[in-house]
A protein has these predicted regions:
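Amphipathic alpha-helical interface elements
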Residues: 1-144
């Protein structure tokens, strides 16, 4: 089971990354943080290629940071969510470039990823979708 199960049917590629990310939060923090950023980028790029309100600002060469700053995205996402997405992107970049990481940062990232994926699923799912609350019990403890 996964906090991201709601993605499985329509966004299986993002689900697989998110599930793997979730499994690593307390075991391999750096990998979890980087994977959170990868899943965010896949989701953002999916939105830009599937939501006509975003088409004008999309260029596949743009970084996820540039896409997060685009005017069109600001019109369809709330400022608090965008702020969280920037934090996830920054923490992911820092982890990828060797900055110090820990399971607390990984926990922050997985929760932001959950917020983003929830927003994406509610906004774009072809069916009405129920998003359960984030369940900490589904995160591996690192003690096996």
């Amino acid at each position: 089971m996964s906090n991201f199960q709601f993605l499985h049917k329509e966004w299986s590629d993002i689900f697989e990354i998110a599930k793997e990310t979730e499994d690593m939060v307390n075991v391999r923090a750096r990998s979890s943080i980087v994977n959170s950023r990868v899943a965010l980028e896949k989701g953002i790029r999916w939105m830009y290629t599937n939501d006509e309100r975003l088409f004008e600002d999309y260029d596949e060469k743009k970084t996820v940071g540039n896409l997060l700053l685009a005017k069109s995205l600001k019109t369809i996402t709330e400022k608090p969510l965008r702020r969280e997405l920037h934090l996830l992107q920054r923490l992911g970049n820092e982890a990828a470039h060797g900055e110090q990481t820990d399971s607390k940062k990984a926990d922050i990232c997985i929760k932001i990823l959950f917020q983003f994926c929830s927003h994406m699923a509610v906004s774009y799912s072809s069916e009405e979708i129920q998003i359960p609350e984030f369940n900490e019990q589904l995160l591996k403890t690192g003690i096996e």
